[in-house]
A protein has these predicted regions:
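Catalytic-core regions of hydrolytic enzymes
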Residues: 1-61
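Short, low-complexity, polar/charged sequence segments that are solvent-exposed and flexible
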Residues: 51-54, 69-72, 118-122
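Charged/polar, solvent-exposed surface patches and flexible loops
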Residues: 19, 68, 72, 113
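Active-site-adjacent substrate-binding region
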Residues: 59-84
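Active-site-adjacent mobile loop/cap segments within catalytic or ligand-binding domains
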Residues: 22, 27, 34, 41-42, ...
Length: 139
């Protein structure tokens, strides 16, 4: 729960994203998963969703594996599908396989409450981990 920005930074979000990319470039991992929480103007919207860079074949495969695990292990009533994207900073700037996992919507009161519990956080982590294993085992 710690941002990768200086407390005095004028734009904390931008600095956080830049530092995430710098870490990825420095360590050159096989894959990267960036964990986030979503928001939307409609408080009824809920559920985890995984994003990948639209032209990344491997990113899409990883996103689908993680999304499937999230939908199954969290018993999502209306499962979301992965979404390709070309405008998110992390997806545009990463040279490797990277997905963004939006664990849920903080603007949905029920989901926001669940996201704050250790039990649910561990379920989300287990689902993401299972999705990564599924992706790697298919390689």
């Amino acid at each position: 729960d710690k941002g990768l920005y200086d407390s005095s930074a004028a734009n904390k979000k931008a600095q956080d994203m830049q530092r995430r990319i710098a870490m990825i470039r420095e360590h050159m991992p096989v894959l990267s998963v960036s964990i986030h929480q979503n928001s939307y103007h409609d408080a009824g919207v809920h559920g985890p969703q995984v994003f990948y860079y639209e032209s990344s074949v491997e990113g899409k495969k990883l996103a689908e594996a993680v999304q499937s695990s999230l939908n199954d292990l969290l018993e999502v009533d209306r499962p979301r599908k992965v979404k390709g994207n070309t405008s998110y900073y992390l997806l545009k700037r990463s040279s490797g396989t990277l997905v963004i996992v939006e664990c849920g919507f903080l603007t949905n009161p029920e989901e926001a409450q669940k996201l704050q519990t250790k039990e649910y956080q561990e379920k989300v982590a287990a689902a993401v981990s299972e999705g990564i294993r599924t992706y790697l085992n298919a390689q």
